[in-house]
Design a protein with these regions (language model features):
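Alpha-helical bundle regulatory/interaction domains
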Residues: 2-43, 89-233, 239-241, 245-251, ...
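Short, charge-rich binding segments
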Residues: 51-54, 72-76, 83, 102, ...
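Glycine- and acidic-residue-biased ligand/ion/polar-headgroup-sensing regions
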Residues: 65-98, 107
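DNA major-groove recognition helix of helix-turn-helix
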Residues: 258, 266, 270, 314-315, ...
Length: 345
């Protein structure tokens, strides 16, 4: 196999992350279109680290951030994900990471639903200071292997579940396979990753595993996140009443579902997303820094922040920098990365 180096990325801006993800996906899946949105949910300066390691028909990634992040992406037909977090030591704070509605702990594997819908979206919350491992498998090869093994339980879980908690030999071996790869013991047979992933899903022991199934609540959260992100072409931000009408759900139900996952109501989530959209607009290098400074107040108004002084205070409390400092810092955005010998392809 042709060896490819690991690629290390360090980001301090969500726009950088989005552009890198889109480019990386398009390159790996030969021009396939892909869209994603990243929103910082906690306050403070953002620092993230990512290591990507492509292998034939497998894409491995390890990601960490000092801030909690909401990550939304389009469901696709190219790959299926298996994600887990680095195990926590006893006495360490509880993980806040949620993958597609499945609350993660050291025995969790989730992310299957990115392949199970057409025209939908998938969302994750990466908890601050958690380390997330993600293995994406090419779906066509995965499907062929499932069929050849008659792994009907695995297929059913992909369709019905968004995550499982289990501690089996296959789940342990899968995690160790990926961790060893990042530690220099390269995956030489990608088929092993497919077989171990299928084995994790094929286990059907209700006494030892806990699963989160698709539900009206998880679907509602997906719809809320997608709806808030949609560009309304200069219209005022979508209201709770409009969301309620569009999703045919009561305001109480919407807020209850939102608080259960994000610990905030729908309007607070919308404010966080809109604030992040302003930061991305102020960071956009397709416009000169001078023009971004000149139009900063209009940019804030476009995303629903009509009172500039109040917006400035909120912006600083959220990101520990002023809008002007964001523009200056992103005058020339450079993705910081280094390469070292690593994965196969």
């Amino acid at each position: 196999m042709l060896k490819k180096p690991f690629t290390h990325y360090s980001f301090s801006n969500t726009l950088e992350m989005e552009e890198c993800c889109k480019e990386h996906f398009s390159e790996y899946y030969q021009g396939s279109k892909f869209n994603c949105n990243v929103t910082q949910l906690t306050t403070g300066r953002l620092e993230t680290n990512t290591i990507c390691a492509p292998v034939k028909d497998v894409h491995l990634e390890v990601f960490s951030s000092n801030q909690a992040l909401l990550y939304e992406e389009e469901a696709n037909i190219n790959s299926i994900s298996f994600c887990w977090i680095k195990g926590q030591e006893k006495g360490v704070r509880k993980s806040e990471t949620i993958i597609s509605g499945h609350r993660m702990n050291s025995s969790s594997i989730a992310g299957f639903n990115r392949i199970s819908k057409t025209g939908g979206n998938a969302w994750n919350i990466l908890g601050a200071n958690d380390t997330l491992y993600c293995m994406s498998l090419r779906w066509e090869r995965m499907k062929e292997r499932i069929q050849s093994l008659n792994a009907y339980n695995a297929y059913a879980k992909i369709e019905e579940c968004i995550g499982i908690d289990c501690e089996t030999m296959s789940s342990t071996q899968l995690k160790e396979l990926v961790i060893r790869h990042f530690n220099g013991q390269q995956i030489k047979q990608p088929s092993k990753a497919f077989d171990l992933a299928i084995a994790c899903l094929e286990v059907d022991d209700y006494s030892t595993d806990i699963r989160t199934s698709r539900s009206t609540s998880t679907d509602l959260i997906e719809d809320i996140v997608k709806l808030i992100h949609q560009d309304r072409n200069g219209m005022s931000p979508i209201s709770l009443a409009e969301i309620s009408e569009h999703l045919d759900s009561s305001k109480t139900s919407l807020n209850r579902a939102c608080k259960s996952m994000f610990n905030m109501n729908v309007l607070d989530l919308a404010k966080s997303i809109r604030l992040e959209q302003v930061r991305k607009a102020l960071s956009c290098q397709s416009l000169s820094s001078g023009l971004r400074i000149f139009t900063k107040e209009q940019t804030a108004q476009y995303f629903g922040f009509s009172k500039w002084r109040a917006f400035e205070e909120l912006y600083f409390r959220s990101f520990l920098e002023t809008p002007e400092e964001t523009i200056e810092r992103t005058r020339e955005i450079n993705i910081s990365f280094t390469k070292q010998n690593g994965g196969d392809s």
